Amino acid sequence: METRAILRGVRLSAQKGRLVADQVRGRPVDQALNILAFSPKKGAQIIRKVMESAIANAEHNDGADIDTLKVKTIYVEEGMSLKRFAARAKGRGARILKPTCHIYVTVGE
């Protein structure tokens, strides 16, 4: 039995999110949460929150035992970019792209 949690539109680049996701893929959830708690990266706290949501979903909806859960799949996809304007010399402007991403976490036994 597998349970999912999804967080969309996170203000984090997909590349930086994948660095954190690769560290916890396939691990037991207690070990994964421990790794995320002590990681200094911004994405670690965001992914930890999504993982806690997936664990709570598994416990509440499916009655799963937390001690046997593992991170089945975790992946980060690119979302829409926020387009911003930065003023430049001689009346010109430059476009600034602020990337977002979607985080998908699946836990199961």
From Swiss-Prot:
* GO BP: any one term: translation
Q: Which InterPro entries match?
A: Ribosomal_uL22, Ribosomal_uL22_bac/chlpt-type, Ribosomal_uL22_bac/org-type, Ribosomal_uL22_CS, Ribosomal_uL22_sf
Q: Which domain of life is it from?
A: Bacteria
Which UniProt key words apply to this protein? Ribonucleoprotein, Ribosomal protein, RNA-binding, rRNA-binding
Q: Name one GO cellular component term.
A: cytosolic large ribosomal subunit
PROSITE patterns (alphabetical): RIBOSOMAL_L22
User: What Gene3D superfamilies does this protein's entry cite?
Assistant: Ribosomal protein L22/L17
Q: Which GO terms describe its molecular function?
A: rRNA binding; structural constituent of ribosome
Q: Which CDD domains match?
A: Ribosomal_L22 (cd00336)
Task: Report the sequence similarity comment from the record.
Answer: Belongs to the universal ribosomal protein uL22 family.
Q: How does it assemble?
A: Part of the 50S ribosomal subunit.
Summarizing the function annotation, the protein's role is: This protein binds specifically to 23S rRNA; its binding is stimulated by other ribosomal proteins, e.g. L4, L17, and L20. It is important during the early stages of 50S assembly. It makes multiple contacts with different domains of the 23S rRNA in the assembled 50S subunit and ribosome. The globular domain of the protein is located near the polypeptide exit tunnel on the outside of the subunit, while an extended beta-hairpin is found that lines the wall of the exit tunnel in the center of the 70S ribosome.
Q: What is this protein called?
A: Large ribosomal subunit protein uL22
Q: Which organism is it from?
A: Aromatoleum aromaticum (strain DSM 19018 / LMG 30748 / EbN1)
Native organism taxonomy: Bacteria, Pseudomonadati, Pseudomonadota, Betaproteobacteria, Rhodocyclales
